[in-house]
Amino acid sequence: MFFQDIIQNLNKFWSEEGCLIMQPYDTEKGAGTMNPHTFLRAIGPEPWSVAYAEPCRRPTDGRFGDNPNRAQHYFQYQVIIKPSPDRIQEKYLSSLEFLGINPKEHDIRFVEDNWESPTLGAWGVGWEVWLDGMEVTQFTYFQQCGGVDCNPIPIEITYGLERIATFLQDKESIWDLDWNKDFNYSDIWLQFEKNQCEFNFRASNPENMRKLFSIYQEEAVSLLDKKLTFPALDFVLKCSHCFNLLDARGVISVTDRAQYIEKIRKLAREVASSWIIERESLKFPLLKK
C-alpha cells in the first residue's frame, strides 16, 4: 500500500466512524497533539471527534537522512474522540485490518506506557501498540491538557505513518518507501531533510532564536490579554519550536532547559484557560449538536 493511500484509507475508516476529517495545522509543531483540534478541543465538556494527518518537526531527531528510521520531520495520523467510545481498542484493530493488517495473523500487543508532554502541561494514561515487535501507535486517555482536567475523557490514537508504511511495504528504510507508484519518500523529502538538519544543527543563529523566543512569548502574553486564544496558541507553538531549535544547537544548559519549559507550560496553561472561558461565554455550543 502506497504511503498516500495509508492516509486516504485512515481518512475513510475514521470518517465512517463519525470523525471530522481535518487538515494539518500550518505552524511548526513537535506532535499532532499540539494542533488546536486536539490541544484545545480535548478540554471542556463539548463532544469532539476528529482525525487528520499531521507533519511533525523534532529538530534533535534529525540525522541528515542517514538513519533509515529517524528524521527531524515525519508524519503522524491523529484521532481524537471525546468522550471516548466503547470498544475503542476493537475499532483501532479494525482500522489496522482496513489497512490490510490482519490482527489474527500478527503479534499485536498493547504495552502500558503513560504519556506526558511537560511543555503542554498535558498527560494521559494508555499504551504503546506494538506490531510484530515494532511500535506503531500511541493510545492515550487524556487526563489533562494545558493543566486543565479533561472531563469527559477523550481518547487519542496516534499512528506512526512511516512505521506502518515500512511494515506494509516490507522496507528497511523510510527513505525507500513508495509514496505513490512514481515517487518514493526520498524523492520528496530527502533534500528537505538534509537542508533542515543543516539549519537545525549548524546554520541557525542561537542568539536570534533566543530573541525570537522572547518576542513570541511577549506576543502570546499580549494576545492572551486581548482574549485571542487561537493566535496566542500559534505563538506558544512558535516558542516551543524555538526552544527545540536551541536544544538542537546544544546551547541550552540544564537550568535553562527547565526555565524554558516552564515558560512554555505557563503560556500553554493560560491558553487552555482562555479557551474554556471563551467557550463557556458561548454556552458551549457543541453541546447542542
Curated annotation (Swiss-Prot):
Keywords: Aminoacyl-tRNA synthetase, ATP-binding, Cytoplasm, Ligase, Nucleotide-binding, Protein biosynthesis. It catalyses: tRNA(Gly) + glycine + ATP = glycyl-tRNA(Gly) + AMP + diphosphate. The keyword Ligase applies. Its EC number is 6.1.1.14. The keyword Nucleus does not apply. SUPFAM superfamilies: Class II aaRS and biotin synthetases. Its main location: cytoplasm. It is found in: Cytoplasm. One of its GO terms (molecular function) is ATP binding. Pfam families: tRNA-synt_2e. GO terms for cellular component: cytosol. Belongs to the class-II aminoacyl-tRNA synthetase family. This is Glycine--tRNA ligase alpha subunit. It comes from Prochlorococcus marinus (strain MIT 9515). The gene is glyQ.
